[in-house]
UniProtKB/Swiss-Prot annotation:
Residues 870-881 have a biased composition (Basic and acidic residues). It comes from Oryza sativa subsp. japonica. Residues 400-424, 846-865 have a biased composition (Low complexity). Residues 194-223, 333-427, 683-703, 837-881 are annotated as: Disordered. Residues 351-390 have a biased composition (Pro residues). This is Formin-like protein 10. The chain crosses the membrane at residues 236-256. PANTHER family: FORMIN-LIKE PROTEIN 10, FORMIN-RELATED. Belongs to the formin-like family. Class-I subfamily. Residues 422-854 form the FH2 domain.
Amino acid sequence: MAMKRVVFLLLLVAASALVKSSRGGGGGEEKLGKFYGWRRHLSSGPAASSLVLSGDLVDKIWSVCLQDIVSPEDTFGFGESFAWDELSSHSTEDELKATLFMELMALLPPEKSSFTYDCIRANCFSLGVPQIFSVALSNYLESQKSLVGSNFYPRRRLVDKLIGDAPSMAPAFAPSMSSGGEVHSPLSVAEAPLTPSNSLNMEPPSPYYPSKSAHKHQGVAPPVSPSEEYHDYMKVVLIAVLPTAALSFLAAFLCFYCCGCNKSKVSVGEQRDDHPLLHLQFSNLPGSSPDVHVPASPLHKDDHGVRPSNAGVSMSKCFPCCFKTSSDATTPTLVTGGTQENNATSDAPKLMPPPPPPPPPPPPPPPPPPPRPPPPPPPIKKGAPPPAPPKATMARFPKLSPTESSRSEESSASELASESSETEVNAPRAKLRPFYWDKVLANPDQSMAWHDIKFGSFHVNEEMIEELFGYGAGNQNNVKDKEISIADPSPQHVSLLDVKKSCNLAVVFKAMNVRAEEIHDALVEGNELPRLLLETILRMKPTDEEEQKLRLYNGDCSQLGLAEQVMKALIDIPFAFERIRALLFMSSLQEDASSLRESFLQLEAACGELKHRLFLKLLEAILKTGNRLNDGTFRGGANAFKLDTLLKLSDVKGADGKTTLLHFVVQEIIRSEGVREARLAMENGRSPPFPSTSDDNSNESLQEDGNYYSNLGLKIVSGLSNELDNVKRVAALDADALSTSVANLRHELLRAKEFLNSDMASLEENSGFHRSLESFIEHAETETNFLLKEDKRLRMLVKRTIRYFHGNDEKDDGFRLFVIVRDFLVMLDKACKEVGASQKKATNKSQANGNSNNPSSQSNPQEQQFPAVLDHHFDSSDSND
């Protein structure tokens, strides 16, 4: 871009040098003196302290007001009158831009220059200049036109001058012919103000149009001869045509070159917005034609900031090195003498806005929006606002080609879809039921399973999840009930009880579907009521204060709550809560008495089961085995032991570390019990339970078949737990609880009897409740007396059973004896299973070795370990029946 700018300036300087070399020297020196006088006026005059025509401001004025109205005919002779050698060596880029701009303003026709000044005033905000300074700027430019305009009008009207009355090549300023035949001349320096007035008018100034008197000649050229006129005419034609043709060719070449470069640098993502912000008609201004329209400001705002429009063919597009659009300036500057001022805080009066524009013509279809950057990451906190968009930047978006336009439309469609989905995500959502979990902090340095999750592969169905897990989802079935309750709200009930007590009573009454009338009838007639209801009423009996409130309430009972209505009906009955207690005893006696009777029967049966033959034989085997182990010590020679010892049999282990003393006792018992069962079967005439090889010697065959006897005895010993079933049931009872239950029944009976004989007798009523209570007391007295007798008898039975095993032990342990036997039976069942598994394993091993056909050839290890018990099996079998 810098190289193009330098080339363009060099071409302008070269073209001006050609024009300068073909012109007279005196006129050039006079014009150069006037030009430098104008420059000195710009730098040293009063305007220099208040107004500065910077390069950025020239760029903005060009893009806003001059870009679409300047034609190639207006630039004829552009840049021919200055001393470019001295100017280019002593001037900066901003000064050069200001100079070229002033020259262009001098060359423009009056109507276009007036339009330019009006545009500057109307677009003060687009130019970055306050409105009060834009008026001063336009007046300033009009005043400077008189300083520089006389240098260019003769050259611009060169052809018209030759046709005039007295053409001359003198250095004096020649008159220029207008299109109407009138002669125009610029205003004098004294007639135009150089600085803005301190007191600005609140109304916008009317457009300036030069008067007809201002277009007259300032002087008359001397007469010339016809030969010199023809010679001068040809010279002027050559001077005007040749440089103009060369300059036009170079300008066209540079125009096409710059346009081609700019088109090649267009980005696919950049787009232009050609819609004007404001349409002003030139007919609104005084003295203007109604067909001329003021071009709107080519600066438009969109989501990305301020962008220049592309209305028609723009010279700035062909000469970007000299004329920058407003998109190149990132910060608008004021044309004030130093510092920027805030328009919002300025104390200067604001000018009246322009008249409202007429409705604009229908705009062309908008181009597709530019592609957006990738969507931001999801917010950290739910409900957090989306991140603020980036600051608007002033960028230039050239027109796209058709292929790039189609690609941009596709990308913009996808971006719009993603933007809409983003908007849906960031939109406020319905609150759902919480899902409690423990979040894990992501570790970027460690590979985790969560890193492989693709966040776009699964989408939550918002409608379904809101329907299922929304806070109002569970109550959708009750919407009608809620609407009915809202439309017809229930009246507020009068509360006379404690809130918690009233709620609990109301829940029980509604659950059992009882009314106050039913409870009243039951207390008067002696009808049966549910036990839970009676217990709840007695437990939540109203206090004396609450009872007093209920008695004093004389209002409508329908205004009371359900609990208050029931309690109000109860307190009107004499001795209501004593009646409820009596009804509760009547309803519970039969159930409690049946439970006590069953427990007493189990206790009596358990005392008899402890004297079972097989259990006593186990105790005998344990006693003899223990005496053998304790032989020679002070523990030996025992005749009995406490049953607590049964729980220690599993603690004594053999040499192998597996076989316990309980295993040994079980092995000995199952052998003897198997032989006894087979012998009883033969004596009772039943067939032998196993095939006998010899009918004459049956006892010998029984002894030889040791494995069979063991299996048969194992079944008998394993069934001992079922034989002592009542012992296990009594072990779950509490002796004190049984005695307390019997005593409570007796106490309730005495209380009901006293209520009948005292309180009910004083009422002298012959109600159904009175008669029911009398008959019930007679029956309850018989029942409670029986239970008392049974309790005493069974307690004595338990004591005798304890003395049967433990001797004269005065300590009363209740049912602890049954608990010990229950735990021993559990250990016995476990030992029987282990012994049966070991025997089955030994049998399979002997069959594999081929010794199963002659079992009597091998000596039984049990006979060697415990021969005394085995020898005594047959001798004591008859006595143990």
